[in-house]
Amino acid sequence: MYDISGWKHVFKLDPNKELSDEHLEMICESGTDAVIVGGSDGVTIDNVLHMLVSIRRYAVPCVLEVSDVEAITPGFDFYYIPSVLNSRKVEWVTGVHHEALKEFGDIMDWDEIFMEGYCVLNPEAKVAQLTDAKCDVTEDDVIAYARLADKLLRLPIFYLEYSGTYGDVELVKNVKAELKQAKLYYGGGISNAEQAKEMAQHADTVVVGNIIYDDIKAALKTVKAVKGE
């Protein structure tokens, strides 16, 4: 079994986006610590299964970030369950999770499941609109969400999600200083190795996503920038 606490760099692949076999091989053989499969819309059991089968040809750890209960399938190493802490809708905080546990609770392998406390900070992002996230927040608000995830809920992951735009480095630094046991994931707007390296100075894990589909070479360079290998 893999130890997620040591992951510094992960790629996130959207099953609803096209990725060539050649580029998928580059991603999986890049030296990244893991590949997360997940997206905000258009995620189906069919495209998740296709992605799973494709990634399983390689040795890289594979995680399903669950956004739709209907798209859950066995075969992944881990399952990340996001709870959007700054959502205005309870369904995205605990509601969907409650329904999933009613249906699948008896057969879930709890050693494979990790809850993520999300704080979504880009109002233009699909995930913000889908979950009705309250993005007009102060730094004090974000710090409070971090404390909620880390100290009250004892979640293993606190995820700062800027999805599509590069985030506030100083805020990421200050959030990291607040966390005692939760790992800080950062995702959003990383388009080059320099940005990835900058965020890696503060976040425990840097998530690289959209740039995979825009500039595969730039995406691959983020691995070494983050891991320093």
From Swiss-Prot:
Keyword line: Lipid biosynthesis, Lipid metabolism, Magnesium, Metal-binding, Phospholipid biosynthesis, Phospholipid metabolism, Transferase
Keyword Amino-acid biosynthesis recorded: no
UniProt keyword annotation of Lipid metabolism present: yes
Cofactor list: Mg(2+)
Xref: Pfam families: PcrB
Residues annotated to bind sn-glycerol 1-phosphate: K12, Y159, L160, E161, Y162, S163, G164, G189, G209, N210
Known pathway: Membrane lipid metabolism; glycerophospholipid metabolism
Top EC class for this record: transferase
Spans traversing the lipid bilayer: none
Quaternary structure and partners: Homodimer.
Protein name: Heptaprenylglyceryl phosphate synthase
Recorded name of the encoding gene: pcrB
